[in-house]
């Protein structure tokens, strides 16, 4: 089961993705529900106990373990993958190096007293095998990789504007304020 903050989907709808703190609360709920537990939903006086009502009655099956793979491109979301998830889905270079991402995952796992024995990590990367003599700006390369690259550029524009991150060095050659 893959789950993230909705960065791509929500931004496509003109909405911001879920913030990291509510995302952690959401992961706690999902993890508990998939374990068949009753979990507390809401805050303070508004909190209520919830659970799956129709589990095991032919509607859905949670008797088998359902692994959660957490989408995490920033350090705090990667730590949440270690705290609540069975795997991390990240991106390179946006999610940092694999070494950095795994250090963040370990931080979250340590915080929760979990081990990473069977933890699965995957990374979204752009890869293009060039034909002999083909250039990176060939029509084929642009057609195949352009949309994915531009989705990442749009993410960075939003992150610089909304969060205030510094423009990464690798994007500076095409960055125009």
State each model region's role.
Residues 16-59, 98-177:
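An alpha-helical appendage that flanks or caps ligand/catalytic pockets
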Residues 2, 59-63, 82:
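Solvent-exposed alpha-helices and their adjacent loops that cap or buttress functional pockets
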Residues 80-89:
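Glycine-enriched alpha-helix->loop->beta-strand junction motifs that scaffold or abut catalytic
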């Amino acid at each position: 089961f893959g789950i993230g903050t909705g960065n791509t989907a929500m931004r496509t709808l003109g909405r911001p993705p879920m913030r990291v703190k509510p995302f952690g609360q959401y992961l706690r709920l999902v993890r508990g529900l998939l374990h068949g537990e009753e979990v507390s939903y809401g805050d303070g006086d508004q909190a209520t106990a919830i659970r799956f009502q129709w589990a095991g009655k032919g509607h859905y099956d949670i008797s088998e373990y359902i692994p959660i793979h957490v989408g995490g491109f920033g350090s705090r979301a990667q730590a949440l993958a270690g705290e609540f998830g069975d795997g991390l889905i990240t991106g390179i270079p946006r999610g940092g190096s694999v070494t950095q991402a795994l250090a963040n995952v370990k931080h979250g796992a340590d915080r929760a007293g979990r081990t990473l024995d069977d933890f699965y990590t995957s990374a979204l990367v752009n890869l293009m095998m060039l034909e002999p003599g083909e250039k990176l700006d060939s029509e084929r390369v642009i057609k195949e990789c352009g949309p994915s690259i531009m989705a990442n550029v749009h993410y960075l524009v939003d992150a610089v504007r909304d969060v205030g991150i510094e423009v990464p060095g690798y994007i500076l050659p095409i960055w125009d304020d």
